[in-house]
């Protein structure tokens, strides 16, 4: 639902609103811990008879007359009527082993978490600011400021390493600094807040 700049300011009292023409509030939205959600899905799948096999490398996809029939792994071939490519950063490389093109490239993703600020609390709604390429939410008493810059820095163009899951990458301050400063201008007091965490990692 569309709300006024004043209503947005009441939801986030620390926000700069003099350049806001309108905002959109989605009261039914929420966020979850992705690891907890994955575990819940896995538990539900097992309860319904699924078998989950971990630590397996998929090396190919089998097909018959243009239709997928299973996957080839380092532990043998598994027949399947449906194969879902949920390989994240590796989805393009897996797709290349089939006739399916997955236009995806891992890129650097940045976020920082500030030290505790007195106006942050868990009931604050998540804010997305497309003009500043930023998103914001409360995190542990501070504020998480994340970036989705218009042209992200690509990572590992020659192929994604197979032994990387949660990599931490060096921060390219020259490239990301202006975006970060602009994003934090939405909440000017954050410029004076300490930084608890600054993170850059690959994301699909």
Give names to the regions the model predicted:
Residues 4, 54-56, 197:
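Short loop/edge segments at beta-strand edges and connector loops
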Residues 67, 77, 82, 111, ...:
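Structural motif
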Residues 21, 107-111, 131-133:
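Short hydrophobic/aromatic beta-strand or adjacent loop that forms the aromatic wall/cage
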Residues 100, 116-204:
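Active-site lid/adjacent beta-loop-alpha segment flanking the redox-cofactor pocket in flavoenzymes
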Residues 77-125:
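Central helical "cap/lid" subdomain
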Residues 1-6, 101-104:
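A short alpha-helix-loop-beta-strand transition element characteristic
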Residues 5, 38, 91, 176-180:
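A general structural signal for well-ordered alpha-helical segments in protein cores
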Residues 24-82, 90:
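Helical element adjacent to the flavin cofactor pocket in flavoenzyme catalytic cores
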């Amino acid at each position: 639902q569309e709300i006024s700049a004043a209503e947005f300011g009441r939801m986030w009292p620390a926000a700069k609103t003099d350049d806001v023409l309108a905002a959109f509030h989605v009261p039914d939205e929420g966020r979850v811990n992705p690891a907890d959600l994955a575990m819940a899905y896995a538990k539900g799948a097992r309860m319904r008879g699924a078998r989950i096999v971990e630590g397996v490398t998929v090396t190919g996809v089998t097909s018959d007359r243009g239709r997928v029939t299973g996957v080839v792994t380092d532990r043998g071939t598994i027949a399947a009527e449906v194969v879902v490519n949920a390989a994240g950063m590796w989805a393009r490389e897996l797709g290349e082993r089939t006739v399916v093109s997955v236009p995806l490239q891992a890129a650097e993703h940045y976020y920082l978490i500030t030290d505790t600020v007195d106006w942050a609390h868990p009931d604050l709604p998540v804010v997305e600011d497309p003009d500043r390429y930023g998103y914001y939410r409360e995190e542990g008493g501070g504020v998480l400021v994340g970036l989705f810059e218009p042209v992200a820095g690509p990572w590992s163009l020659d192929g994604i390493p197979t032994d990387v899951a949660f990599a931490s990458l060096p921060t390219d301050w020259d490239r990301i600094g202006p975006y970060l400063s602009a994003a934090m201008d939405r909440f000017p007091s954050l410029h004076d807040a300490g930084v608890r965490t600054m993170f850059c990692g690959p994301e699909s």
